[in-house]
Amino acid sequence: MKIGVIGGGQLGRMLALAGTPLGMNFAFLDPAPDACAAALGEHLRADYGDQDHLRQLADEVDLVTFEFESVPAETVAFLSQFVPVYPSAEALRIARDRWFEKSMFKDLGIPTPAFVDIQSQADLDAAVASIGLPAVLKTRTLGYDGKGQKVLRKPEDVVGTFAELGSVSCLLEGFVPFTGEVSLIAVRARDGETKFYPLVHNTHDSGILKLSVASTDHPLQALAEDYSSRVLKQLDYVGVMAFEFFEVDGGLKANEIAPRVHNSGHWTTEGAECSQFENHLRAVAGLPLGSTAKVGESAMLNFIGVVPPVEKVIAIEDCHLHHYGKAFKAGRKVGHANLRCADMATLQAQIVKVEALIAE
C-alpha cells in the first residue's frame, strides 16, 4: 500500500518510520526543498494548492492523509474527488479554524473558555468589555506553538493588538486559571472503533511544548474520553486526533483539537504497545487498531533549536533519541527524547538528566 502525505516534516517522517514495517510506501507533497520526510519516500515538491501535483499524488497512491492542519481544506476536498482522504475535509475545516472548533465544543456540551469572534479592533474592544481581562486573542487559523496569539492582561495591551496579529479574523478567549494542561490522544477506525491512550501532563515554555509525561489511572481519564468521543462521532472521524484540555476545578475545559498525530503523543513510540503513528496508519488504511496500553512509565522531552550531542543523549539509561534531520534553528523543533522506565521515581530522575543536557 502506498500512502500519500500532505506535508513532509517530522510528523510525516515518523509516520513513514512506523508504516515501513507494515509494508507501506510513502509519497510526500511539500514545497520545502529540504523536507525531512523526503528521505523516507517520494518527494513531490509543490505548493499545497498546486492541483496538477495534487492530481499526480492522487494517481500514485492508495489513500492520502496529512501531517498538519494548516493545509487548506480546499486541498483535501480536491484530493477527495480522486482518492480516499483521511481525516475528511470537513474534519479539517473545523479543526483548523478556532471559531468552528469552539462552536462545535459548545454545541456538543463540552466545557470551553468563553469566546467571541473578532473581525476588527472595535469588535475586540467590545469583547474585552464583555469577557474582561485577562484574556487571550488568537488568530482563527494558522496558530501553533504559541504563534498567532497574545495574552491581554491590562487595558494598554488591547490597543492596536488586532493590527499586531495581522488584522485577520481572530477569537478572543477568556483566560482560564488552570491547574494543569493535559492532552488525550485518540484513534478512531473506519468502522468507528475507538481507542484512547493515557492522559498526558504537558509543560510548555513560551507556547512550545517542552515536556509530556504519560499518566497512570488519571482521575479525569474517563471524562476526557467522553468529551473526545463526542467530537470523534460528530465528525465521523478516521485517524488519530489530539485533544488539549485545561484542568480546572477538578474538571476539564477543552482548549483545542489537532486532526493528526501530535507532539504530546510522541512518547507512544517506545511507551505504548502500538504508537500513535502506527495506529493512525492502521486507522486510515482500514487495518485493525493496535493496543494503546502503556509499557512502563514514559515521558517525552522536546529538543528546541538544537539536539544535544548524540553520544550524551543515548548514554542516559532508558533514553531513546529521535533526531529529525532538520537544520538547527532557534525556536524550531529539531528532535526529541523518549524515556521509558520501570517506575515513576526512575522516570523523574531520568527527566532531570535530559533537562540538564538541554540546559548545557
Please give the residue ranges for each predicted region:
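Short, low-complexity Ser/Thr-rich regulatory SLiMs
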Residues: 186-190, 245-249, 325
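Peripheral (often C-terminal) accessory segments that flank ATP-dependent C-N-forming ligase machineries
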Residues: 282-360
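ATP-binding N-terminal substructure of ATP-dependent carboxylate-amine bond-forming enzymes
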Residues: 1-100, 107, 122
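Active-site "cap" helix and flanking loop/linker of ATP-utilizing ligase/carboxylase catalytic domains
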Residues: 222-243, 248-249, 258-306
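A short linear hydrophobic-aromatic micro-motif
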Residues: 114, 134-136, 169-173, 241-242, ...
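Active-site nucleotide/adenylate-binding loops and adjacent lid/helix of ATP-dependent enzymes
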Residues: 94-183, 187-234, 355
